[in-house]
Amino acid sequence: MRIPRGLWGIVKEVARHLLRRPVVGIAAAARTEDGRWVLIRRSDTGEWALPGGTLEWGETLRSAIERELAEEAGVRVIGLGDLAGVYSRPDRDARFHAVTVVVHARVTEPEKPPVNPAEILGVRLFDEDDLPDRLAHGMSDMLADARGAEPRWE
């Protein structure tokens, strides 16, 4: 079936407006009740990161954070806390423009392995003075901000 030229132009314009929108990302600055940080090790780079992902259609931020923590780190949320930061610079990630909301979370210790081992190599609890140096893109700022007193807005 051939789409008329005028209609094709309309379809392309609508797609351009609908698909060129920032992705909504979430990450959890998650700590166990004894204060250890929960970090995941990414399989694509081997680097450490805060657990997180993208908001799915119909999800709230709370449900997305709970889902990602369960899937990636095998932990349950005990309570969500304050905002750690909002990251929206278009050049922050070369793959796409994301607006990432990072919140503090109090969680259980890992109860099960990550759901997708092709995405997550492992989960580890880190003491404050033992945090890894090798962090995934953008995570150094996010973790530093989560350790600070004031949330970041960019």
Specify the residue positions occupied by each region the protein language model found.
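A structural signal for short, well-ordered beta-strand segments
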Residues: 28, 83, 103-105
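Active-site-adjacent beta-strand/loop module that shapes the phosphate/pyrophosphate-binding cleft
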Residues: 88-112, 142, 146
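Conserved Nudix-box catalytic region and its N-terminal flanking loop in Nudix hydrolases
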Residues: 32-75
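Acidic, metal-coordinating catalytic segment for phosphate/diphosphate chemistry
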Residues: 1-27
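A short coil-to-beta-strand element that immediately follows conserved catalytic motifs
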Residues: 76-85
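NUDIX/MutT-family hydrolases
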Residues: 102, 114-147
